[in-house]
């Protein structure tokens, strides 16, 4: 799962080490990606924004998991 998340972020043009993610970095990444068309992305397609959104969701789940 970690490898898949890393690969997804690399596909988005952003490489994030899961072990080094901080809330500030996370929101900075989300702030950079949001203008790329998140709101217009269809999750039913394999579009790049949708893939980035999926990667972001996976990463958030990893961060908040007890």
From Swiss-Prot:
Keyword DNA-binding appears in the UniProt entry: yes
| Keyword line | DNA-binding, Repressor, Transcription, Transcription regulation
The source's domain of life comes to Viruses
Q: Name one GO molecular function term.
A: DNA binding
The record describes the protein's role as: Repressor of the ant/reb gene.
Q: What name is this protein filed under?
A: Repressor protein C4
Classification of source organism = Viruses, Duplodnaviria, Heunggongvirae, Uroviricota, Caudoviricetes
